[in-house]
Amino acid sequence: IIIPSYNEEGNVAKCASVVSKLLSENGIDYELVFVNDGSKDRTWDIISNLARNDKHIVGVNFSRNFGKESAIFAGLETAKGDACVLLDCDLQFPPEVIIEMYNIWKNNDVDIVEGRKNSRGKENPVYKFFSLWFYKMINKSSGLDMEAASDFKLLDRAVVDSLNAMPERLTFF
């Protein structure tokens, strides 16, 4: 599970606990790769402490904020599993869906399982406006419906290896 983390000191321990418990209870072998994206708070201290005390947790630390996509790529380069799930540290996406994604991947011949929000939930109206505007512009310029796109997804190892082999790192998940 790749977990980009920026100023998430209030979420890291809960995320680790919830996701670890969920995967353990479902008999899924796992590692949690927390990538600290140059946080200004205690995020890295908490990740380091968790990693020292739990063999399932790995931490990657950036010296400054490089952005979520860079953190995702660092996690993909670090992860060793047969599949990787991208998950926000604030658990904005329900972690229980990881089990559904895993089962779809395990029982079908698919390389990517995409998560999608049913609703945007509560968010700042200004953020919501600009987000909707951004996706409208992207959709119009690309001819693709990107509004439903999400970085909550499961990637098969073959996909991870292909992404890691690409020289481009400024991508949009």
Residues covered by each model-derived region:
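Short beta-strand/loop segment that forms part of the nucleotide-sugar
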Residues: 3, 20, 28-38, 60-61
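Short, well-formed alpha-helical segments that are part of the catalytic scaffolds
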Residues: 8-23
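Acidic helix N-cap motif at the loop->helix transition within catalytic regions
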Residues: 10-14, 41-50
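Short helix-capping segments at alpha-helix termini
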Residues: 23-28, 50-56
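A conserved acidic beta->alpha catalytic loop
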Residues: 36-45, 91
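Acceptor/aglycone-binding surface of glycosyltransferases and processive sugar-polymer synthases
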Residues: 49, 58-64, 68-78, 83, ...
